[in-house]
Amino acid sequence: MLESSSKKIKNRKWWLILALPAWVYGVFLAVEVVVSLAVGALIKIGVPLNSVNSVIFNTVLSVVVYILSLIVVIGVPFLAKKRRTTLSNLGVNDWPTFLEIFISPFAFVAYFLLTMVTMSIASGVFSVDMQQKQAIPFSQSMLATHWQFIMAFVVLVVLVPIVEELLYRGYLYGKLRNSFSIWLSIIITSIAFGAAHLWVGPDSPLQWAVAVDTFTLSLVMCATREYTGAIWVPIMMHMAKNGIAFYFLFVNTGAINQTESLLPFIFM
């Protein structure tokens, strides 16, 4: 019995703990760089991308980066090593069940309460600035018409949650869970998800408040992924969070001053 469990521990591919998160995040960064260089090259040869409406431009850019990242993360291991990732591996083998829809609000409340604790600890112990906001591809001044609001909404509240959940709670958590325990898989996935929101560019400060909040969000979303076997609850939670942020940032901006001191983590 002891020999069997010791063999299992030895046979585990511990390098995956670093390799898988680095692969998911590294691909996303690489795709961003490649797309950015491609845009710069097109502008240099005379393609008038500078004259394109900023909302349309950022929407198209976001769609390209997110979809391409998903394709590369899943496709390259299959092409190179025949490591296939099925819909079942990603947690999307079936449509959302009534149970998943029912528990989503409760899971969101659990995250809400837990992040109040983690953000308080981060603020009190590590002096993290809780008023720090997440860098996003749209600003209030950019959105002037209904279709611009719709495009920003589709990117922030639909595209981003779906693709990020496929990458992190789907691909990353699923692959880690094949080799490691529930809690180790949850912790590694959540650290990776938080770290992915920490750095946004060489000219911007590290987003520590955002990293702590997204780490906490991931803990709850990974738990629901494990419980239900699917990523529908994480997707619904992620959409709800981004939807609330979208409402306060772009629709009812006057409410921010009244609620930001109480719930700063919502505006990320």
Model-assigned labels for residue ranges:
Residues 113-116, 134, 138-268:
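Transmembrane helix-loop-helix hairpins at the membrane interface
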Residues 1-102, 109-112, 116, 120, ...:
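N-terminal, membrane-interfacial amphipathic/helix-forming hydrophobic leader that caps
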Residues 44-52, 92, 126-131, 176-186:
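Membrane interface segments of multi-pass transport proteins and intramembrane proteases
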Residues 19-23, 103-107, 151, 155-156, ...:
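Alpha-helical transmembrane segments of MFS and MFS-like solute carriers/permeases
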Residues 97, 128, 132-136:
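Alpha-helix initiation/capping motif
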Residues 91-94, 105, 189, 238:
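A general structural motif at alpha-helix termini
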